[in-house]
């Protein structure tokens, strides 16, 4: 039987969170924060998303349910782009095939919040021999 009691004082401790989730996106989905939502559609710190069969949207959870700085990475491992919207339906990002995006909350004053996003490792680069000399 699983217990959530500390061996160092018998206080109740929560189960550990998960850090990775594979998402098969076959319809629009609204995510929730794991501490506020039951079910499978929760945010994980790292999510690999495969969008198939259409143009789908991921709606982010309410920003005002967590602290500023809450973050996660979304990697599109499929061949189809998908959209990301805030909790009020506003456009946040389009994640193209092969892209990885880092999302974090900079304001949680509303459910929509203010999200900052940057792209990891998209594109190519090469050394310029004249710059190296």
Sequence positions of predicted segments:
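Short, Lys/Arg-rich amphipathic alpha-helical interaction segments
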Residues: 107-122
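Tight coil/turn sites that cap or link beta-strands
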Residues: 96-100
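Exposed extracellular interaction/assembly regions and N-terminal maturation sites
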Residues: 1-84, 111-112, 132-133
């Amino acid at each position: 039987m699983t217990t959530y009691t500390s061996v160092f004082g018998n206080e109740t401790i929560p189960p550990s969170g998960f850090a990775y989730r594979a998402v098969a996106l076959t319809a629009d989905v609204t995510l929730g924060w794991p501490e506020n939502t039951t079910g499978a559609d929760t945010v994980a710190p790292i999510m690999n998303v495969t969008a198939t069969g259409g143009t789908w949207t991921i709606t982010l959870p309410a920003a005002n349910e967590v602290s500023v700085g809450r973050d996660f990475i979304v990697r599109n491992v499929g061949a189809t782009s998908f959209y990301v919207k805030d909790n009020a339906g506003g456009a946040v990002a389009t994640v193209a095939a092969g892209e990885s995006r880092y999302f974090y909350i900079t304001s949680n004053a509303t459910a929509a919040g203010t999200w900052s996003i940057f792209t990891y490792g998209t594109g190519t680069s090469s050394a310029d021999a004249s710059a190296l000399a």
